[in-house]
C-alpha cells in the first residue's frame, strides 16, 4: 500500500494545486484540485480517476466553485442529469460535472472530453487573470470538501483511523499561510 500526497504552488494564476495518489494491488486512485488565485470569482478545477478493480473505474471532473449554493455552468459542455446523488449541483459542483463509470481499458475514450473541459478552464483563467491572494474565499469550500470527501472511508480501511483522519484533516484542509511545496508518503 502506498499513498503519496502533494501540495504545490503552480503558475502566476494559481494559489495551490493539490494532488493525492493512492495505490495498492487492487486500486489506483488519483485526485487533483487546481485553486486559482482570487479576485475573479473563478471555480477550482477538480479531477478524480479511481480504479477499484479490473472492472470498475470512476472518472470525475468538474468546475468546483468555492461559493456555496452557487450553480456554476459553462455553455457548450454537457450538463449532468442529476443521477449521481453524491454530487450536489450548486453546492460547489457545477451543472457540467462529468461522471462516468467504465473499465480501465475504456478510460482513454473520455480523454477528448477531459481535454475540452481543461481547455475551457484554461480560457477562463487566462481571460480573468486572477491575481488575488485572499484565501478566505476557499474556507467554506475546503471545509465542505473535507467533510464530504469519500476518501476518508477508503483510507480508514487501508491505513487505519488515525492516519486517515490525519490525511483528511491536516492535508485536505491545509492552511494556505503555511503552504510550501511538500509531499507526504504513508
Where are these regions (language model features)?
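Conserved small/polar residues in nucleotide/adenosyl-binding loops
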Residues: 1-7, 177-186
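Short Lys/Arg-enriched alpha/beta "domain-start" segment
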Residues: 2, 6-40
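Extended, non-transmembrane interaction/recognition domains
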Residues: 39-40, 44-124
Amino acid at each position: 500500500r502506498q499513498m503519496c500526497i502533494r501540495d504545490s504552488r503552480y503558475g502566476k494564476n494559481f494559489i495551490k494545486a493539490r494532488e493525492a495518489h493512492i495505490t495498492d494491488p487492487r486500486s489506483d486512485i488519483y485526485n487533483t484540485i487546481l485553486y486559482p488565485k482570487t479576485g475573479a470569482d473563478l471555480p477550482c478545477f477538480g479531477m478524480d480517476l479511481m480504479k477499484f478493480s479490473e472492472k470498475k473505474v470512476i472518472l470525475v471532473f468538474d468546475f468546483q466553485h468555492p461559493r456555496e449554493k452557487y450553480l456554476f455552468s459553462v455553455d457548450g459542455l454537457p450538463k449532468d442529469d442529476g443521477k449521481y446523488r453524491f454530487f450536489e449541483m450548486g453546492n460547489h459542483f457545477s451543472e457540467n460535472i462529468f461522471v462516468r463509470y467504465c473499465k480501465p481499458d475504456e478510460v482513454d475514450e473520455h480523454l477528448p472530453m477531459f481535454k475540452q473541459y481543461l481547455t475551457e478552464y484554461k480560457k477562463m483563467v487566462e481571460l480573468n487573470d486572477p491575481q488575488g491572494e485572499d484565501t478566505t474565499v476557499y474556507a467554506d469550500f475546503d471545509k465542505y470538501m473535507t467533510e464530504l470527501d469519500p476518501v476518508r472511508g477508503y483510507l480508514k480501511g487501508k491505513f487505519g483511523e488515525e492516519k486517515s483522519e490525519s490525511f483528511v484533516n491536516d492535508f485536505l484542509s491545509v492552511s494556505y499561510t503555511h503552504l510550501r511545496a511538500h509531499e507526504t508518503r504513508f
